[in-house]
A protein has these predicted regions:
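N-terminal secretory signal peptides
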Residues: 1-29, 33
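A conserved helix-loop-strand patch within extracytoplasmic ligand-binding domains
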Residues: 110-157
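Ligand-binding cleft/hinge of the Venus flytrap
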Residues: 58-66, 142-178
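An extracytoplasmic/periplasmic, membrane-proximal ligand-sensing/linker region
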Residues: 53, 166-175, 179-196, 208-210, ...
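A bilobed periplasmic-binding-protein/Venus flytrap-type ligand-binding module shared by bacterial periplasmic
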Residues: 123-133, 229-242
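A ligand-binding cleft/hinge motif common to bilobed small-molecule-binding domains
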Residues: 93-108, 191-216
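Extracytoplasmic "Venus flytrap"
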Residues: 39-56, 77
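Short helix-initiation/N-cap motifs at beta->coil->alpha
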Residues: 48-49, 71-83, 177-188
Length: 293
């Protein structure tokens, strides 16, 4: 009996090689697609609770819904604006206009693009606990001893600090403005509130402290701090070509006091900003869809 020669293994090996080659090519293609989207660099002010909340929510949406890698860069407000203008940053969601960041806008208006408000109805001024006697900047001198003749501020050079310096002159306040930081100011407020002591701080809304304490702004009859403001999304113009889907999202993204308040309070309560943002996204899928559809 004549035995048939064994079949050559070469065709099988060739097939396997081709299959593996196609698989590798497919994998390379997938990786290329995954890497095709550029990293979006977002500047924010780490000591501002609204900036932290809004930035982390936007970053989570851009990553998970739009598929872009995101890098968050904490900076002082002036450097943040400069970074967007120079193209070192693609965007910020922390531009307070028209008053607080007026000087920055004047300096960089030809190099940035204002997309619109992500939080309307913002406000800056001097904030006091609801139990204090003073009601207005105009009569604050009458109660200055209650406040130990001082106003607790935030970072020197911040817009609200400059306006407070103007207010001290305009109202003839015999009080010292003490620079600190956002977290330090909030800690001072917490200590005074727990002890039922009078305290005046430079502040703003949105801020988690309005959800935690009963506070109010002192009236400003001379309108030193200006009318209501809005927190805007501002981009480097190059983002239009770099990530048009991100720009489209920013044009729709605007949230309400109770929405941002929930994230800010969660962070103040100990949650990591990214975790608080992701939980809010999971609990508000319809709202997120409005911004990304």
């Amino acid at each position: 009996m004549i035995k048939s020669p064994p079949s050559s293994p070469r065709p099988r090996r060739t097939f396997l090689a081709q299959t593996l080659g196609l698989t590798a090519l497919a994998a390379t293609g997938v990786n290329a697609l995954a890497q095709a989207k550029p990293t979006i660099k977002i500047g924010f002010v780490d000591g501002w609770s609204d900036s932290v909340a809004t930035t982390h929510l936007a970053a989570s949406i851009i990553r998970s819904k739009l598929g872009y890698p995101v890098e968050l860069v904490p900076l002082a407000a002036g450097i943040m604006w400069q970074g967007v203008a120079r193209g070192d940053l693609d965007m910020t969601l922390s531009a307070w206009l028209p008053v607080t960041h007026e000087a920055y806008l004047t300096n960089f208006k030809d190099k940035v693009q204002i997309i619109g408000a992500n939080y309307p109805g913002a406000k800056i001024g001097l904030i006091v606990p609801d139990y204090v006697k003073a009601t207005s900047l105009a009569d604050l001198n009458n109660f200055r001893a209650d406040f130990d003749n001082r106003i607790v501020g935030i970072d020197a050079g911040a817009g609200v600090m400059k306006k407070t310096e103007e207010a001290i002159k305009a109202y003839g306040l015999e009080m010292r403005l003490l620079p600190s930081s956002g977290p330090a100011m909030a800690a001072e407020l917490d200590r005074a509130y727990r002890a039922n002591k009078a305290i005046a701080v430079t502040g703003w809304i949105p801020h988690w402290m309005f959800a935690k304490y009963k506070l109010r702004f002192l009236a400003d009859p001379k309108n030193i701090y200006g009318a209501e403001e809005h927190v805007d999304s501002v981009i480097n113009p190059g983002l239009n070509a770099k990530a048009p889907a991100v720009v489209a999202f920013l044009k729709k993204f605007s949230w309400k006091p109770e929405e941002i308040g929930a994230v800010m309070l969660a962070v103040e309560g100990g949650s990591k900003p990214a975790a608080a943002a992701e939980k809010w996204m999971a609990d508000n899928t319809a709202r997120v869809s409005e911004w990304t559809s």
